[in-house]
């Protein structure tokens, strides 16, 4: 619940769809997967409190969290216990690496993700701006003090320098800000070809609306946080904006999931990429649990937890609905991004890039 419920609810629903289907087909080695559900409200303290309560109730693995900052707080706790943890949507490098600023930093070997990471998104969108949009100049608009936003911004700027994409203006805002007129006026005056805004959907909608009012006609570009932005600005203002996603709607690999999700939750469309990513993340975690069960280990023991972790780590091309899963040395999946364009008020899949 809370400000980011449009991420959290699809994550919950996508994961539960997979687990309910798994249980309906016999579960894992004849055992049903029991889920203890907690609402962290997008807050790190709430997430850790929920984790401690869950441990008291005898959990064997953790699915979550949804937001980057919340997941890092949770990962600090699960790391101490070597508790298997899979997140569908937390993209910062600091989720699996203890200190991203230190090249020699240890990783959290127990933590995995189904989504791609912040630097990967930022680099991909810089490449896309140059290769696909023929951009020569760019402005950047990001949220200070936000791991996700700053991570994408830094990666985009570094890649832009490498590609010769000139950054003509950089603007920022703080959490809770809603009036972006001043920043968008500055960006409009800089007249960039593209504006990279690695922010979440609600703020993205406000920023794009303010930019158009200020006379800025640049193409807005975002990361996966843009998902659902169509609900937060007019179709006219959003037209031509693009973002990268971990989900390619309508493609063969996700059609059955889309049908099942719509039927299960009585909705007309998949809300955003977080539902299918959560479906895959639940699959990854359950495949790990299956490996531990097949070894006859006792749930909750150190050996059991390590077997779950090892099984996920050693996946090599395990098929999910958003792509195949193998993991690099930092427990990040190796997979392409989907490019989504805002067209006629809809978020339309363009290509894998």
Residue spans of the language-model regions?
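Extracytosolic ligand-binding ectodomains
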Residues: 1-353
């Amino acid at each position: 619940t809370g400000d980011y419920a449009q991420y959290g609810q699809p994550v919950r629903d996508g994961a539960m769809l997979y687990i309910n289907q798994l249980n309906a087909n016999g579960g894992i080695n004849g055992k049903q997967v029991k889920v203890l559900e907690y609402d962290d409200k997008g807050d790190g303290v709430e997430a850790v409190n929920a984790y401690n309560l869950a441990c008291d109730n005898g959990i064997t693995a953790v699915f979550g969290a949804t937001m980057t900052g919340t997941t890092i707080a949770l990962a600090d706790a699960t790391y101490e216990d070597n508790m298997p943890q899979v997140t569908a949507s937390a993209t910062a490098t600091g989720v699996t690496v203890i200190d991203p600023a230190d090249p020699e930093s240890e990783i959290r070997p127990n933590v995995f993700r189904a989504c791609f990471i912040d630097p990967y998104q930022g680099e991909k969108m810089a490449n896309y701006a140059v290769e696909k949009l023929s951009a020569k100049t760019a402005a950047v608009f990001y949220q200070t003090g936000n791991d996700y936003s700053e991570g994408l911004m830094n990666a985009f700027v570094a890649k832009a320098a490498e590609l010769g994409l000139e950054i003509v203006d950089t603007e920022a805002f703080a959490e809770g800000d809603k009036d972006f007129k001043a920043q968008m006026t500055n960006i409009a005056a800089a007249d960039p070809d593209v504006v990279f805004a690695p922010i979440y959907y609600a703020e993205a909608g406000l920023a794009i609306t303010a930019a158009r009012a200020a006379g800025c006609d640049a193409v807005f570009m975002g990361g996966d946080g843009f998902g659902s932005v169509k609900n937060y600005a007019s179709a006219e203002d959003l037209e031509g904006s693009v973002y990268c996603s971990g989900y390619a709607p309508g493609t063969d690999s996700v059609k059955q999931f889309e049908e099942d999700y719509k039927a299960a939750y009585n909705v007309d469309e998949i809300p955003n990429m977080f539902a299918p990513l959560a479906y895959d993340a639940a699959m990854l975690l359950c495949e790990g649990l299956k490996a531990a069960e097949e070894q006859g280990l006792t749930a909750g023991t150190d050996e059991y937890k390590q077997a779950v972790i090892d099984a996920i780590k050693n996946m090599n091309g395990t098929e999910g609905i958003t792509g195949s899963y193998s993991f690099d040395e930092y427990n990040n999946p190796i997979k392409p991004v989907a490019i989504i364009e805002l067209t006629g008020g809809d978020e339309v899949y363009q290509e894998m890039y």
